[in-house]
């Protein structure tokens, strides 16, 4: 698992999400879809007012080349959280 803040270009050790029931359901659906079809690569969950967004991605050896270069470096770096 990698938790990445693209604005600061830093990995995070943990994150807390406070979700509405609708947002939680949307996140669960997106995660389920990606688990069943990793080739879809990533999904987005937005807050009700679209002021915040969570991007989730599933990576495998087979779909790693579909990520941008920065993401590939992050995902290949096994020594960091």
Predicted features by range, described:
Residues 1-81:
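Positively charged, low-complexity terminal tracts
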């Amino acid at each position: 698992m990698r938790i990445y803040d693209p604005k600061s270009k830093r990995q995070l050790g943990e994150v807390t999400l406070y979700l509405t029931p609708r947002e939680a359901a949307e996140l669960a659906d997106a995660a389920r879809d990606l688990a069943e079809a990793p080739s879809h690569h990533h999904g987005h969950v937005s807050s009700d007012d679209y002021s915040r967004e969570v991007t989730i991605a599933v990576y495998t050896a087979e779909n790693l080349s579909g990520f941008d270069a920065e993401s590939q470096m992050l995902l290949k770096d096994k020594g960091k959280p």
